[in-house]
């Protein structure tokens, strides 16, 4: 379980990185990127930045590549606002939790439709006496 300091720093980084991506980075590959969460290492030297990217697999890979290329620039913009000994290294990861949630919802809808079909089939069959 992350410490209070890790959680606070992760939340701060999530907000700052999202703002920097939106306002400072002019890369067209970053059009539909959202920072979903940040996980800090116990020593606060590394930050896994999870992002959700709307688009095809190729567009997602291109956006991740652009983010990793801009990691040094983002660190420099964040540095004056951090009161830590070290500025964390940023590691961008694709957050697939939204895709997973969508897949679960789709499966649940499919099960519900199958149940409704089964119930209507049972109701429409004549009862034997």
Curated annotation (Swiss-Prot):
Top-level taxon in the UniProt lineage: Bacteria
GO biological process, one term: maturation of SSU-rRNA
Alphabetical UniProt keywords: Cytoplasm, Ribosome biogenesis
Localization per record: Cytoplasm
Cellular component annotations (GO), alphabetically ordered: cytosol
One GO MF term: ribosomal small subunit binding
InterPro entries: KH_dom-like_a/b (IPR015946), RbfA (IPR000238), RbfA_dom_sf (IPR023799)
UniProt entry tagged with the keyword Metal-binding: no
Function per UniProt: One of several proteins that assist in the late maturation steps of the functional core of the 30S ribosomal subunit. Associates with free 30S ribosomal subunits (but not with 30S subunits that are part of 70S ribosomes or polysomes). Required for efficient processing of 16S rRNA. May interact with the 5'-terminal helix region of 16S rRNA.
The protein's assembly and partners: Monomer. Binds 30S ribosomal subunits, but not 50S ribosomal subunits or 70S ribosomes.
Family per similarity comment: Belongs to the RbfA family.
Protein name listed in UniProt: Ribosome-binding factor A
Gene behind the chain: rbfA
């Amino acid at each position: 379980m992350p410490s209070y300091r890790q959680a606070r720093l992760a939340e701060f980084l999530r907000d700052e990185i999202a703002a920097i991506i939106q306002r400072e980075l002019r890369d067209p590959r970053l059009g539909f990127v959202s920072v979903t969460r940040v996980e800090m290492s116990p020593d606060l030297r590394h930050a896994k930045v999870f992002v959700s990217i709307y688009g095809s697999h190729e567009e997602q890979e291109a956006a991740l590549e652009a983010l990793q290329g801009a990691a040094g620039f983002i660190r420099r913009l964040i540095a004056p606002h951090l009161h830590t000994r070290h500025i964390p290294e940023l590691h961008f990861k694709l957050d697939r939790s939204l895709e997973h949630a969508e897949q679960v919802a789709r499966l649940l809808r499919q099960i519900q439709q199958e149940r409704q079909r089964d119930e209507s089939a049972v109701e429409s069959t004549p009862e034997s006496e």
